[in-house]
Amino acid sequence: MTSIKTLIIDDAVPYAHEIFSHLGQVVTLPGKEIDADSVRHADALIVRSRTQVNASLLKNSAIQFVGSTVVGLDHIDQTYLHRHRIPFYSAQGCNANSVAEFIISALFDLAEHHSFELTQKTLGIVGVGNVGKLVAQKARTLGINCLLNDPPREEAEPRKNVLAQARGENFVSLTECLTADILTFHTPLTQTGKHKTLNLLSAERLQQIKPHQIIINAARGGIIHETAWVQTQTLANVIDCWEDEPNISPPLYQTAYLATPHIAGHSLDAKIAGSQMVYKHLCKVWNVMPQDRWQKFLPPPPEPMNVTEQTTMQATLNALFRQTHDIHKDDQAIRAHDINEVHKKYEHYRRHFPVYREWHQHQVNVTNNPHLYKTLKQLGFQLI
């Protein structure tokens, strides 16, 4: 008789019971409460970013599989898993579109607030992986000039560089990229190696930043030297990722035009994609046929939207983006005069983050504006 398997799953994984229950008994726990005792007799562990998966957690456990439904890897001791032959899967790319849409929304908000035309600015994208390439794709659709910096990709894809150069899409040095009007970072956090990204935007490099420039970090805390960043005069900072979360830096917090609690990749679609990717891989490891009955539990699609045209195309798009996800609400949700209160709000908002859907889930009614129709279609909206 086959024993029923036990799966310990972070309770922030959406639809955990609906997706995973046919594989065994599902036990959900807050990520920070998953400890050695809770996984001791479990067969699978599925986490987000709040659980440190290492020897102290797993050494006396029966865990046969570890899955992470988020893209970051700094909470996973992959060396330990490999040494003990524990299969591991991370949902790389699951939230890339969500983060890219957050960046584009922030760009349009900044442009309207500071009264500049995005088509007259240059966007420097540092890190052109799953997220960065989508940011570039969407930005170029919207007529924004981009500079791309990604040394690991540049080295790994030398044959592609000739074709990319012909399209005007070749990589540039970090020094050149940092001359862009707006800088957005999309690298992993790596602390060693030839291309380490810890303090990639170092105190020395921050001295080169000019007061008209904008810095966005929706990648990882630690990529930008936070102490030096506080002393750097910029037009604006948009910060979604911080060192030592949720105990974010009070001085840096005060500099942010938009301060959000690491939620750029938190669309419902991104979370479901992460769960699904891990689920399908676990089914493969356990030789089980995947099921899709969980889909009937999803919320209905958003109500169709009518576009209210503004005086400019940029203003029209900004208003539409705010209809789909108003990032100012994310900022206001953690704002407080007392930094200790900010820290409390930070964690609470992440755990109780409101549901929002990505652009491809939204139906938009556009009349008598072929250019707007084409642009929205290229961005993934459903046109009616």
Predicted regions, residues:
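N-terminal glycine-/charge-rich "phosphate-binding" loop or analogous flexible N-terminal tail
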Residues: 1-42
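Phosphate-coordination loops involved in phosphoryl transfer and adenosine-cofactor binding
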Residues: 3-4, 119-122, 212
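Rossmann-like adenosine-cofactor binding region
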Residues: 53-54, 155-250, 379
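NAD(P)-binding Rossmann-fold cofactor-contacting core
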Residues: 14, 141-162
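Short, polar loop motifs at secondary-structure junctions
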Residues: 10-16, 31-34, 49-52, 150-155, ...
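Glycine-rich adenosine-cofactor-binding loop
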Residues: 10-11, 92, 100, 119-140
